Amino acid sequence: THGIDNPFIEYRDSLSDQNTDKDKYTLVLANPPFKGSLDAESVSGDLLKVCKTKKTELLFLALFLRILKVGGRCACIVPDGVLFGSSTAHKAIRKEIVENQRLEAVISMPSGVFKPYAGVSTAILIFTKTEHGGTDDVWFYDMTADGFSLDDKRSPIADNDIPDIIERFRHLDKEADRKRTDKSFMVPKKDIVANDYDLSINKYKEVEYVAVEYPPTEEIMANIRELEMQIGTEMDELEKLLGL
């Protein structure tokens, strides 16, 4: 229950008509199950209006938008496919969040953070329900470590990006000047729209290549010949030792 003294928990299908919650919550923190596809007949009709799909990872995003009050915020974990999927439904839910709500951040997490249960790469989406847009610059962070090894053992390690993520997110006003080669950076909405609402960090992150200087070709060839001569000499000595 994550520190909540008196949690209210109901057993029901959140994506079906059993769940009538709407405009009810000011905050949604979620790591919903992504079990694949559902029977479309069991899905609430108003969710299908947002994105017509059977995929639970997309339907849950539509659900969070429905149950939030205007001004309410959501931080939810999604599989990477949500960020760049090319289906009509994938694009529809991303467009809904970017154009009609306010997308604030995309935190990319490495595969392994949910091992030994799942090895899929995931991300955290942070957005506010506005119903009138408001997305401006979206903050991206490339998380590579969470304080534990990324294998099935999940042993504690020194590398941990989480404190840095929290610190940078608290001071987004200082993020505007960061280059896209950094761990975090801002991406303007127009760039996201131009890329068909793709939210994968690799779409925008830039890799800084360091030029490697090599010796002149003549010098390399001379070194190769010298090594060949040395090998030949040592082979002769070895044959003498073996009496060949």
Language-model regions: role of each:
Residues 11, 16-244:
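A conserved structural/catalytic subdomain of Rossmann-like adenosyl-cofactor enzymes
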Residues 1-6:
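Short, conserved SAM-binding/catalytic segment
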